[in-house]
Amino acid sequence: MDVPTHQAVPQYPALLDATRRIAQDVAAQHASDVDTQARFPIETIQALRQAGVLSAPVARELGGAGCNLLELGQLCAALAQGCGSSAMVLAMHYIQVACIARHGLESSFFRDYLRELVARQYLLASITSEVGTFGDTRASICALERGDGRFVLNKDATTGSYCAHADAIAVTCRRDAHAAGGDQLLVLVRRQDCTLTQTTSWDTLGMRGTCSPGFRLESAGSEAQILPHGFADIAAQTMVPYSHTLWSALWWGIAADAVNRAAHYVRGEARKHPGTVPPTAMPLAELSAQLQAVRHHWQAVAQAFDAIGASTQDGGATQDLHGVGWALRWNSLKISCSEAAPQIVHGALQIVGMLGYKNDSPFSLGRHYRDTLSASLMVSNRRIAAQSASMLLVLKDMP
């Protein structure tokens, strides 16, 4: 993809200001068309590129902003208030960049790639799903083939979010043909290294702009593109924490925009009858409290993660992230926020009424409702709850 070279990447405060402007001036303006046409939010992603937002997780010494998990969550939450699909693309991109930034620094290839990502503002996608694993991202069927410093990797993915629009794709696979399904590696496949053949469609209820059909991936490249750490460590220390936190942040952002629309409606009702409190003001206050609770939840978990200094260089911290306590914390965050977001949007709809139900109304909440319904399905809450149930059987003290 031909993208402009970005010379100077702003730091977090400037990135947050830019993201808020993009959410309002670009993402929100195109959100309805992105949703209706189930098309990639190209205008928003291009605006994020121009503002240097895509390299936010990259360390400052490599030219990035060095944003921590809480700061990345704030960026995703801000964008989600304009367009949920755009925010999901940004969140998934950040997850993959973080995997490289936190687990690839001992490799000269990945250090150079991160510098290039900062300069070119590359967009990264991932393929962690696979036909035959039934949604278990911690198991792979496909295996890496190596020889003469090169690799070959082919994979049948059930979903590949915005892969057709990405500059590179992070792909999970078995270490080799003799490895167990859970003995996985993560490989960075650049767009020029692969061919993608779409195998399914993407005509969904919500999150339509993520463009996530199934793909057949055929790729080859240098062994240097294989992350040096096993995927089990990458998942526990980075992919799971970043996924559940950034997703929760953007679900909050979608719900926040729904509450803002409800608040605008209630203020309009109040102006019609000066000196009186409209009956919709009370449920709005209750809804605001629910929204605040969700925000406090994801921000508190992000702050706790950042506070332990969980870098791949800190053995004690990384061991903590492999423990039952942190696993339960991530599971609780994901389930709680994914269930609360659509409930909050539903509450906003009850306040606004038919104007929220109509698609051509400035108070329309249909897209918000449909987008948040995806939250409990992307990594099924039932699967996560079953994992938590098993862990609670052996946990002596609640985290």
Model-derived features with residue positions:
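Glycine-rich phosphate/cofactor-binding loops in nucleotide/flavin-utilizing enzymes
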Residues: 352-399
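Glycine-rich beta->alpha junctions and the first turn(s) of the following alpha-helix
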Residues: 202-292
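Glycine-rich phosphate/pyrophosphate-binding beta-alpha loops
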Residues: 158-163, 243-247, 378-379
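C-terminal helix-coil-helix/basic helical segment that borders enzyme active sites and/or dimer interfaces
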Residues: 31-35, 293-336, 349-359
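Short segments within alpha-helical structural elements
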Residues: 343-350, 386
